[in-house]
Amino acid sequence: MSRIMIAGTGSGCGKTTIVCGLCQCFKDMGLKTSALKCGPDYIDSMFHSRVLNMRTGNLDSWFCDDETIKYLLARKECESDITIVEGVMGYFDGQGFGTKGSSYDIAGITDTPVILIVNCRGMSNSIGAVIKGYTGYEKDSHIRGVIFNNLSSRLYKDAAQMVKEMGIEPLGYLPYKKEAVLESRHLGLVTSAEVEHFQEKVTCIASQMKETLDIDGILKIAENASE
């Protein structure tokens, strides 16, 4: 059963954009893809549903017990070649200053490998400090790879080498492209129906991913998820 979690360093780092792009990439490859969102957020799930043309869902460890979460995930996996779980907020953010209800909590309950999205805008060497902090914050972070968002091709080689030395797999980068931005507002993302030229933007994101992400590496991590 192939699955991955796409988690981030915080809200606004590009999780939903990257999940939508990956869903489109996998669809283009002929893979039956399903998606789930950590927490009760229904707006991001609407984005997933629009790309995949199917109903998606949520995994919420605040409202559901562990067995229910495992059941909801297994139900999606049974009908898919690959399942993508989108994280919520920052990876370790849960109730207050605890991890209950966090993406990390869901990854632990379901034993799902995690790919961390790092928004690299305004950073260079500090990228390494951020990643080292996230991968070392808990004994087993479940983080198996990193995608660098808003990073130039010029900086990627050094960033990738830095991550490799930490024992984490660099899985590519995405440069900033204005035409691929999914709009947001003060209280978060607009709904998918409010995004102008939504499918064109998702197609643009997926096209960029095919050039600068290690899609095979992402699939390999997903395939190594425990059954």
Describe each model-derived feature in a short phrase.
Residues 1-2, 227:
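Intrinsic structural disorder
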Residues 2-13, 17, 23-110, 118-145, ...:
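ATP-dependent carboxylate-amine ligase catalytic core
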Residues 14, 21, 64-67, 182, ...:
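Residues in flexible loops and secondary-structure boundaries
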Residues 114-117, 171-173:
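Short hydrophobic alpha-helical runs that function as membrane-insertion/retention elements
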Residues 125-227:
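Internal gly/pro-rich beta-alpha loop/helix module
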